[in-house]
């Protein structure tokens, strides 16, 4: 079957299982917070760690999981990652206490990191070169479907069965994906001795990213003493400096320095962070603006689905609608510019259901054009042998963007004068300004990439629409 002309697309379909589940899990959990507060008898400040620990573990482990995939085989790491994720999901649904749930969420993050770090690499090495952009769009579409279903499905499951069902829903999909991956994913193992793994670099990465995320959470309203926040900020800076020094001096770095010296890669990773900041920011912002008017979590989730649905449509069909002669940078610029225009206009418009739905849909369309094109530029910036590591870096950038989107929206609402409760149109302006600036940054990054195809010899060039190199 692997030799059939359909085999690459069957492999892409298997990877879409992981893309779907990853984004479903990202958007479904937060809606269960009130139910968990009642069940465990704890405040929301404690329940927030259910999401925070998952995000910390995911960002810290993505690069190691990508390197592991390059060393021992992407199919092996991806399949075992799904197994870990599925078992941990079932265990989360049986957690007897909040502490146990937090620990199990960290185990779930281990499996998710193994999935996400290798998913983009499996797509790019499975799909035909001339169809890579379309394949990445299909994967992005699967992500958007998971993201769109999360809030509504989570609210429905919590109301009818209970919050534990939110974790159990991962189990049947996970089992199906493990079986499909065993037979449909291509073998990528390179029977060579893997390099020594950079465990000190991994620990430093865990330290500074964890401290940074805690600082961002504190800036967004988490009740931490000032001295604790200052100490965490100092730890984040010191950890980052030590991590950079380690990666520059060690013989076997976790993140090879030559990768980060690539201008297309550096721009692409920054673009990925900006794109996911704009994608996840409204998921925090809009419930604060319209949650009271809509009256239920299910209705709020249904309204929010306009953003990921627009994202999915553009990711799947943008390759057909846009001119075939356009480069990835041109496609990315068009999408980011559309999103920037929408967010910029939102600064001056009243926030109502009638205005927010088309705004979210248009912003989603723009992001659906930008993200696959940006991913293609990143994955073509180096050789296939580093594809899993690149995939891990892309997922790490997405995680950072997601975290920034959540934290900066809370901070912007605070700066707008919202201490608790719901915000009005005027109070939301700082948040929309943040989203517009992030989208404008993504557009500038894509515009800068247009010169790459005319770059000097020896540098990676952007792929043309036919799949070759221009």
Can you annotate each of these PLM segments?
Residues 1-7, 191, 448-470:
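Intrinsic disorder in cytosolic terminal tails and internal cytosolic loops
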Residues 1-183, 347:
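Transmembrane-helix bundle of Major Facilitator Superfamily
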Residues 8-31, 44, 119, 200, ...:
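12-transmembrane solute porter fold
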Residues 21-32, 57, 74, 166, ...:
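Short helix-kink/termination motifs in transmembrane helices of multi-pass secondary transporters
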């Amino acid at each position: 079957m692997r030799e059939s002309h359909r085999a690459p697309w069957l492999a892409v379909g298997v990877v879409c299982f992981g893309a779907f589940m990853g984004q479903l899990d990202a958007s479904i959990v937060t809606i269960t917070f009130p139910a968990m507060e009642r069940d465990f008898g704890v405040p929301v400040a404690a329940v927030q760690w259910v999401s925070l620990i998952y995000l910390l573990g995911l960002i810290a482990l993505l690069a190691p999981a990508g390197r592991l995939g390059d060393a021992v085989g992407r199919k092996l790491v991806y399949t075992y990652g799904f197994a870990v994720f599925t078992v941990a999901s079932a265990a989360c649904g049986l957690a007897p206490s909040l502490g146990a749930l937090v620990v199990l969420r960290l185990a779930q993050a281990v499996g998710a990191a193994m999935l996400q770090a290798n998913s983009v690499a499996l797509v790019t090495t499975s799909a035909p070169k001339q169809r890579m952009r379309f394949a990445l769009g299909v994967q992005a579409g699967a992500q958007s479907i998971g993201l769109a279903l999360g809030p509504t499905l989570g609210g429905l499951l919590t109301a009818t069965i209970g919050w534990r069902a939110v974790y159990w829903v991962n189990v049947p999909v996970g089992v199906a994906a493990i079986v499909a991956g065993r037979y449909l994913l291509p073998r990528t193992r390179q029977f060579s001795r893997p390099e020594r793994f950079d465990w000190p670099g991994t620990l430093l990465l865990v330290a500074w990213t964890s401290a940074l995320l805690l600082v961002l959470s504190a800036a967004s309203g988490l009740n931490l003493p000032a001295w604790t926040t200052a100490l965490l900020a100092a730890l984040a800076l010191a950890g980052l400096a030590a991590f950079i020094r380690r990666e520059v001096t060690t013989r076997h770095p976790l993140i090879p320095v030559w990768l980060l010296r690539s201008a297309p890669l550096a721009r692409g990773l920054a673009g990925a962070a900006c794109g996911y900041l704009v994608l996840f920011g409204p998921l925090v912002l809009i419930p604060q603006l319209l949650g009271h008017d809509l009256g239920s979590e299910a209705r709020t989730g249904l309204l929010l689905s306009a953003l990921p649905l627009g994202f999915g449509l553009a990711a799947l069909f943008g390759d057909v609608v846009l001119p075939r002669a356009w480069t990835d940078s041109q496609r990315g610029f068009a999408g980011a510019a559309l999103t920037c225009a929408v967010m910029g206009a939102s600064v001056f418009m009243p926030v109502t259901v009638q205005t927010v739905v088309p705004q979210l849909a248009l912003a989603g369309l723009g992001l659906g054009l930008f993200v696959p094109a940006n991913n293609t530029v990143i994955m073509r910036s180096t050789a296939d042998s580093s594809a899993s590591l690149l995939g891990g870096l892309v997922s790490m950038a997405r995680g950072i963007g997601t975290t920034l989107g959540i934290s900066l929206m809370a901070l912007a609402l605070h700066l707008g004068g919202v201490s608790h409760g719901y915000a009005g149109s005027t109070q939301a302006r700082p948040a929309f300004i943040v989203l517009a600036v992030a989208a404008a940054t993504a557009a500038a990054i894509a515009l800068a990439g247009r010169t790459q195809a005319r770059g000097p010899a020896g540098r990676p060039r952007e792929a043309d629409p036919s799949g070759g190199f221009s």
